[in-house]
Amino acid sequence: MQKRLTLLGSTGSIGDSTLDVVARHPERFSVYALTAHRNGDKLVEQCLRFQPEVAVVGDADTAASVAAKLREAGCKTEITYGPQALVDVSKSDGCDTVVAAIVGAAGLAPSLAAARAGKRILLANKEALVMSGAIFMDAVRDNGAVLLPVDSEHNAIFQCLPREAALHGGVSKIILTASGGPFRTREPATLVEVTPDEACKHPNWVMGRKISVDSATMMNKGLEVIEAHWLFNLPGERIEVLIHPQSVIHSMVSYADGSVLAQLGNPDMRTPIAHALAFPDRVDSGVAQLDLLQVASLSFEKPDYTRFPCLALAVKALAEGGLASAALNAANEIAVEAFLARQIGFMAIAQVVDAVLNALPNRSAHALEDVIEADAAARRAAAEFIARLPDGARRTERAVQ
């Protein structure tokens, strides 16, 4: 039976990769809805190729522009806009599968709507679990939704776990691998000089600018630790991070009998996307087979928290529980945005996040409203902290110890 997809964030890198896989298997997948924020021209191209019933954009002006271009081309796709429109296409009866690929907190509401509607959810938006882990997982369970991880690391773990996962014993720990990003071997004292363009040059993966910066700070890996906690029901002390510069082993599961199962493959997001789209089947992803003879070596090392203080902050937020992870994510989004705008230096990202976590009281999350309030408070606190940084100090902050 053909799956009908809503693709949240279709114009981003995950969206591109998803549509590449979809195009290879028209008998298996069709597109019900595509969504973008402001990249109207690219969305028009996608609509003309995949002919979705609905397309969603961020604002009225972009909607009018996209609608006019589609009418001129004879495309009948309906154009809507705004946050509620994202929620509507995520819970619509027109789709059975939602690919959640919107970056950041903006993806929480539509992802949660898909869970409450009992959809099959391919989760690439890790912030949904980072911000509202218990609330999100309860919605998945209570409404019969199916949650399949698309992040390469979590998809790798999913492939290495028995279907009953860690709840039934036998799993000692899971091991998330990380490339270490572009600054793995750079002298820590020089990281204050890093530019946005340097931070966005990932050695192995092709990603958007925000997630590229998160990879460079290793905040991305920290968020993945939190995500893994919720996905696989494991405490933080049973989730290990290892730097693996080759990005060939995407993650591992260690078992009580001494076995370690690993998932290997070329670093291309189409592999985990194809796995999740077709699960439990396997389909061609378009990714070349891994040639083990060409893999010169596989190396591993422990992450350096002095070089990567954001990873330490994320692990700390998970241990604290409550709304700490939501505050961490919000502060990081504001700090990364400021860094990309050249308002603060690279190492100030961790300083901003640390300051926000120390300034805001932590409390339990009982409802989505609690998460939204914590997110807003952390964003305000981060912006205020950035505004107070002296101009001359913004690029010379020391790392959080």
Swiss-Prot record:
Belongs to the DXR family. Keywords: Isoprene biosynthesis, Manganese, Metal-binding, NADP, Oxidoreductase. Its cofactor is Mg(2+); Mn(2+). The keyword Oxidoreductase applies. GO terms for biological process: isopentenyl diphosphate biosynthetic process, methylerythritol 4-phosphate pathway involved in terpenoid biosynthetic process. Disulfide bonds: none annotated. This is 1-deoxy-D-xylulose 5-phosphate reductoisomerase. The keyword Endoplasmic reticulum does not apply. InterPro entries: DXP_reductoisomerase, DXP_reductoisomerase_C, DXP_reductoisomerase_N, DXPR_C, DXPR_C_sf, NAD(P)-bd_dom_sf. It is an enzyme of class 1 (oxidoreductase). It comes from the Bacteria. 1-deoxy-D-xylulose 5-phosphate binds at residues 126, 152-153, 179, 202, 215, 220-221, 224. One of its GO terms (molecular function) is 1-deoxy-D-xylulose-5-phosphate reductoisomerase activity. NCBIfam families: Dxr, PRK05447.1-1, PRK12464.1. Its EC number is 1.1.1.267.
